């Protein structure tokens, strides 16, 4: 799902790597976690759309049914809100969709927990995702935004570090979107409703949890689209190689290329 890992830091080396050099960018742990997440999230999104087809309306509060006012209603086309090519299974089956969804929810939740523990133990989260005070300055954020908008990507050793927009995006997914998806999913579980209800209280009811689950899921879709676009624009072969083999060729700047 994401390309986040500890990288070789230029300041820790006697000679900083130059553009054109092959460097180790992603460990085997991150690469395995990335591709498992790709599969898990894809299955969960498609099975989630099938579950949504059973009642394509969203509400706030504890209850929601056909007579109640929905804040979002997706009109049906050919009898369903989302067509079969976007769902798992492709033909309507709420029971099967829930089985797929729950099975891969465990894969996602356990994988996230293990990755976060590993990232803390290895120091990756603090070292590579921590946003320094200087990076919070509006001028710094605006500069990085303009660089991205102009498709000016870092070269040489600078390509080994995450900029503030990348850090914000990755932290938003790791610490906001994914935990929110998992917790709101638990809140909607009938087994949880029969036991402790503190999650229901936190999210304001089962229907509010369902709405937040839907919003967070499509926030994740938005991240994927931007992530894939950046991979393509930055050089898909080099980026894919780094997430398959771990090795990344540092981009050259214009002067080096000349």
PLM regions with names:
Residues 1-258:
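Membrane-embedded alpha-helical bundles that constitute the cytochrome b-like, heme-associated redox core
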